[in-house]
Amino acid sequence: MKTVSEQMELARKAQAIVNDYTQEQIDEICLAIGWEVYEDENIAKLAKMAVEETGYGNVQSKIIKHKRKVGGVLHDIKGAKSVGLIERNEETGISKYAKPVGVVCAILPATNPTATCGGKAVGILKGRNAVIFKPSSRALKSTTEAINMMRAGLRKVGAPEDLIQVLEDPSREAITELMKVSDLIVATGSGQVVRAAYSSGTPAYGVGQGNACAIVAEDADVAEAAKMICGSKLFDYATSCSSENAVIPVEAVYDQFMAEMKKNGCYLVTGEDREKLKNHMWKPNAKGKIALNPDIIAKSAQVIADGAGISIEGTDILLVEGMEPILGDKFHDEKISPVLTVYKAKDFKDAYRILVELTNLVGRGHSCGIHTYKHEYIEFLGEHMKSSRITVRQSMSAGNGGHPFNRMPSTATLGCGTWGGNSTTENVHWRHFINVTWVNEPVAPWTFTDEDMWGDFWKKYGK
């Protein structure tokens, strides 16, 4: 087993080699490693390994996720400049040159180990960097297999395979050391992991907690909205932090919406069964704090219902009606499972109130969605919601992280801004893995008169 310092030395030697690569050579590297975690046989193997090892999600969804995430990053970087001169503006005299950030420490989640690993590697290497991945201990085998596949891709094009490594020492001391000696950290995982990254002393990108919530307005295509929400919630048994946790249909379409949800395989849990479900989903953890039961995370509705002692048949998603006060009902929380809370709102104004309260309690800064064609609703949310991304008439688990039907940058790392304790609101993607040098040349100077600057101000307030 290599030490962190030994792995870092290998990474720096590999990065030094590609530091002088051309754009064409770097793009070949990205295609080589991308293919290894996109090719059908390989990703079927990785998906099966990930489900067997972690117990999270399902194989078919993880195969699709590989295609979406890796394919999405490859689409985003195709033709993009990341070596040398990337931009020149003759009018301003500004030229921009891309430089590597160096060696990146990338911390991976157990819920989405191999697709996140593949997409991240492509984006990081696009900037002529090296990466050392720290997998979840629960997903070590599947993540290592994905990394070995990509190392084979590097060998195929004659590139140094140590551009991509997995941290060999699983100890807490090793990951702490790796974070300190890396040039940049990208942390996709729990709040504890992200806080450790931010406190390491190394520049870091992290994610905030999810609790994606969507409004269904009175003008929505209700059948289509229900279909999208169910598809999003069921996908990989809701491993994605962008999977809808709550939906807020307005009263005018509530009954129709619930009927459509039933058509899409949902079952409304009520009465004593609702209480049983709550008590099964949230239990005291090792510290005695009520927390999400690990046994329900990314499991099927049937497995969750069986554990709760609820009788259901042919059900894909469990629904519960939300109660107010919202804080007093645990179902407002992030669930990471095919369990969805439904809140009935009087109208859009009331739906907005519920949305704000939900996301202020959990998932501040992450995301929200709306199913509507009314631009005034969309613009109102854009103006007022403290969300880093607002997804309109789309599946949130697909749309938030980039998809062919929108132009969001493809990623599995969603920044939540200062609202969520992060350094950016952006989808963390390949452009976050380059340093940019700004070269400025002299141009005609700008000037202004006092009247130009303060004229209107003086008219209103005087000198």
Give residue spans per PLM region.
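Conserved C-terminal structural/oligomerization subdomain of aldehyde/semialdehyde dehydrogenase
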Residues: 15, 19, 310-463
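Short internal beta-strands
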Residues: 132-137, 248, 393-394
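Structural signal for hydrophobic packing residues in well-ordered secondary-structure cores
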Residues: 12-22, 30-41, 50, 54-58, ...
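ALDH superfamily catalytic-core signature
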Residues: 118, 194-326
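Rossmann-like NAD(P) dinucleotide-binding subdomain of oxidoreductase/dehydrogenase enzymes
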Residues: 82-224
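Short, flexible turn/loop "capping" segments at secondary-structure junctions
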Residues: 7-9, 206-208, 237-241, 329-336, ...
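N-terminal Rossmann-like NAD(P)+-binding subdomain of aldehyde/semialdehyde dehydrogenases
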Residues: 1-95, 123, 263
